[in-house]
From Swiss-Prot:
Residues 673-763 form the FDX-ACB domain. The gene is pheT. The keyword RNA-binding applies. It holds the Pfam family tRNA_bind. It comes from Helicobacter pylori (strain ATCC 700392 / 26695) (Campylobacter pylori). InterPro entries: aa-tRNA-synth_II/BPL/LPL (IPR045864), DNA-bd_dom_put_sf (IPR009061), Fdx_antiC-bd (IPR005121), Fdx_antiC-bd_sf (IPR036690), NA-bd_OB-fold (IPR012340), Phe-tRNA-ligase_IIc_bsu (IPR045060), Phe-tRNA-ligase_IIc_bsu_bact (IPR004532), PheRS_beta_core (IPR041616). It is found in: Cytoplasm. Keywords: Aminoacyl-tRNA synthetase, ATP-binding, Cytoplasm, Ligase, Magnesium, Metal-binding, Nucleotide-binding, Protein biosynthesis, RNA-binding, tRNA-binding. Mg(2+) binds at residues 433, 439, 442-443. This is Phenylalanine--tRNA ligase beta subunit. Signal peptide: none annotated.
Length: 764
């Protein structure tokens, strides 16, 4: 919104220091985006055109005799609207207009001693085409008086950015209220007009569901010529039009904040009614003819009569916004500027707008009418401690009361003798944004100053609000992303499958009483008990489509024989690990341990143990149980060659894991050694039926000092019942670099345990 300092002086005496005023307004939350001086140049004075004669050598030029007080100057002018008896701004010799210095000159053979100026040439917004015509609205016109001695020509124009909740400041009066409250200067109210109304000229009726409040003045003997001071105010705000009545209406709305309208009348008495139209929008009807939609669209009045009906209206901004949102007719004509003001909250004191407009029209008021409507007071009660808690700053009771009273609030102490004291505050009806105690605290903070708040660290104790379902979801999403990073493609299958195929591959099936009673098809006649069957089908489809390297991942529900649901993860690889490309011209095939390593990158480290029972799908020598946290969580295996041949697949491997048995690693800090580690490789002769997992567990349980890790390296046949197992012992300390004696001591203790537990000995 734009307004001038001269506009503000209508309601309040503004301080002389304009820069300080802009700074203070911004502190109050009314951010001043720009402050532009609008001051007429020096040596531009008030003149009066005495005579106008055509130029003898130019059709479009006129030779004017202009009285500037001390003398009469001959000035050549090219404006079409120049005429005798006009008061005009005259730039004398030496005046700087823009970048041009005015001097005596000769135009087409005729001397010219000055320049008659337009508003643009003076540095003001455009008022009209041609020269600027002065009138008494800017002050008493004295010939020869400097133009910048008149207030409208010596001012500053402020552009103020408002937040949507401050509709009360979308007017000159609203900004003046803030200045009055901050500087403790009196506010000049809009004067009420004294008149004796006639009766019977207007009949006003309003429907039962009408929420808007409307007030009317019937006037006559009005003056509809827009004076210069109004033109300047509207031009500064980019609201000046060629319609004089619209200019007066816009000027009154801009100054008072009341939504104004006017109707031209041909006859009186009249039947005035307010009711909902076909779009359920409140509208005004005169003699049963629709004339406007309240707060949304006003008709432009062109053919003006002697009598005018002035209208002031107020609509609750929330109610209006809801109606606009629910409006089904998207083609309805709307006035966006009108909606902008109405939806942010206009001034509900309708008499302010009517009195202001009538006074500037210099009209005679014949009658007044208004709808029955009363705004409910918004009362808030609070303790001083509440304000202190919100702001973190203790403000004296007297200061709080003073700030709120200056802003138009009614403040009283409820139960003065009670402790703590309770304040009761009634918000003014034009403050639509005041609804809670936090809003009251914000008003106090605006005037106390946010810079005066004491910075304090926030004291906050955060409790862990963990959602186990979300944590589970994120865990499996992370597993999926890891699988994708390892080259697996996610697949999804139905939970239904063929019972016969599952039995053929050696998977359990549902007990007969628990089978599906009405299967979709014979191919989907049971609930799946494994993800592997679907993965095999997907692998075959991809092979038939020409893919030679297939890696699939699936998470889904399976069911045991008791029809209990279990969440599992399935992995399947088929074909080549690396496609045919240099240096692997024939590609690189998968092997059991490469696949196991790939799965471990997804689910974490695990160990393997030999399967005790075999199924038709598993290779008898390349299958194992997956152990994690000393618990069996799944199976990993190469698919039996017979199954590969029957299904016409590439050589394939699979892993199926119980999803909820997977370990979820916590973020734990573990120390690491900054000292070098020592490595000792040992080849042990042990019984061929001894599992490495047993060896590892025995050494771990013994807690041999400095022995941090034992790894299997190689295995080969030694004799009928024994094998040679090569293992690596990693030895290091967190405290120091170990010497040979300490390293050998750890190795010797390990050998003693292995000999005792497994009858193992070093190979000679």
């Amino acid at each position: 919104m734009k307004l001038s300092i001269n506009d503000l002086n209508v309601f309040v005496n503004t301080p002389k220091d304009i820069a300080k005023l802009c700074e203070d307004l911004s502190r109050l939350g009314l951010e001043v985006e720009s402050c532009i001086p609008c001051i007429a140049p020096k040596n531009v004075v008030v003149g009066k055109i005495l005579e106008k004669a055509p130029h003898k050598n130019a059709e479009k030029l006129s030779v004017c005799q202009v009285d500037v007080g001390k003398e009469v100057l001959q000035i050549v002018c090219g404006a079409k609207n120049v005429a005798p008896n006009q008061f005009v701004p005259v730039a004398l010799n030496g005046a700087l207009i823009g970048s041009t210095t005015i001097a005596k000159t000769e135009l087409r053979g005729v001397e010219s001693h000055g320049m008659i100026c337009s508003s643009i040439e003076l540095g003001f917004p455009k008022i009209n085409d041609g020269i600027l015509e002065l009138d008494e609205s800017v002050g008493e016109l004295v010939l020869g008086k400097e133009l910048n001695e008149y207030a409208p020509f010596n001012t500053h124009v402020l552009e103020i950015s408002l937040t949507p909740n401050r509709g009360d400041c979308l007017s000159v009066l609203g900004i003046a209220r803030e200045i009055s409250a901050f500087y403790h200067t009196p506010l000049k109210p809009i004067k009420a007009l004294n008149f004796t109304p006639k009766s019977g000229l207007i009949t006003l009726s309003a429907g039962e569901n009408i929420e808007s409040h409307l007030a009317y003045y019937l006037i006559c003997n009005h003056s509809l010529k827009t004076p210069l001071n109004i033109k300047l105010s509207l031009a500064h705000n980019n609201a000046l039009s060629e319609n004089d009545l619209n200019n007066f209406i816009e000027f009154s709305t801009h100054f008072s904040g009341v939504i104004m309208n006017a109707y031209s009348l041909n006859t009186t008495p009249m039947d005035l009614s307010v009711k909902n139209d076909e779009n359920n929008l409140e509208s005004v009807y005169i003699n049963h003819q629709k004339r406007s939609t309240i707060a949304i669209k006003h008709q432009v009045q062109k053919d003006l009569s002697e009598c005018l009906l002035l209208e002031a209206s107020y609509t609750d901004p929330i109610s209006l916004s809801l109606k606009l949102h629910a409006l089904k007719d998207k083609t309805l004509q709307k006035d966006n500027a009108l909606i902008y003001r109405s939806a942010r909250g206009s001034n509900p004191n309708l008499s302010d707008g009517l009195n202001f407009l009538s006074a500037h029209l210099k009209a005679t008021i014949l009658e007044s009418k208004q709808t029955e409507h009363s705004l409910k007071d918004r009362t808030l009660t609070f303790q001083l401690e509440d304000i202190t808690e919100i702001l973190g700053l203790a403000v004296e009771k007297e200061k709080i009361q003073g700030i709120l009273k200056n802003l138009g609030f009614k403040v009283s102490v409820k139960e003065p003798n009670s402790k703590p004291q309770i304040l009761e505050v009634i918000a003014p009806n034009f403050r639509h944004d005041i609804k809670t105690i936090q809003d009251i605290a914000e008003e106090i903070l605006r005037f106390v100053g946010i810079d005066n708040l004491v910075s304090k660290p926030l004291h906050c104790v955060s409790s862990k609000n963990s959602n186990p379902n979300y944590d589970t979801h994120r865990f499996f999403e992370n597993l999926k992303h890891k699988a994708l990073a390892c080259g697996f493609k996610e697949v999804i299958h139905y939970v239904f499958y063929s019972k016969e195929k599952q039995q053929k591959l050696g998977f359990e099936v549902l007990e007969d009483p628990l089978e599906l009673q009405n299967p979709i098809t014979t191919e989907l006649n049971t609930l799946r008990t494994s993800l592997v069957c679907g993965l095999l089908d997907a692998s075959l489809r991809n092979k038939n489509l020409g893919f030679k390297s297939i890696a699939l991942y699936e998470k889904g529900s399976v069911y045991n024989s008791k029809r209990e649901e279990i969440q599992k993860l399935g992995f399947l690889i088929s074909g080549l690990q690396k496609k045919e490309s240099y240096p692997d011209t024939k590609g690189k095939a998968w092997d059991f341990y490469s696949f196991a390593e790939c799965v471990s990158k997804v689910i974490g480290d695990f160990s393997l143990e030999k399967l005790t029972t075999q199924t038709p799908i598993n290779h008898p020598y390349q299958s194992a149980k997956i152990i994690q946290n000393h618990e069996i969580i799944g199976v990993i295996a190469k698919i039996h060659p017979k199954v590969i041949q029957e299904l016409d697949l590439f050589e394939s491997y699979y892993a199926e894991i119980d999803a909820f048995k997977l370990k979820r690693p916590a973020m734990l800090l573990k120390p690491f050694s900054i000292y070098p580690s020592s490595v000792r490789d040992l080849t042990l002769i042990i019984d061929e039926n001894t599992a490495f997992s047993g060896i590892k567990k025995a050494l771990k349980d013994a807690q041999i000092p400095n022995l941090s890790e034992i790894l299997p390296l190689d295995i080969f046949k030694e004799s009928n019942n024994s094998i040679a197992l090569s293992v690596r012992c990693v030895i290091h300390s967190l405290e120091k670099t170990l010497n040979d004696e300490e390293v050998n001591s750890a190795v010797q203790k390990a050998l003693e345990i292995l000999e005792k537990e497994f009858n193992a000995r070093l190979k000679g």
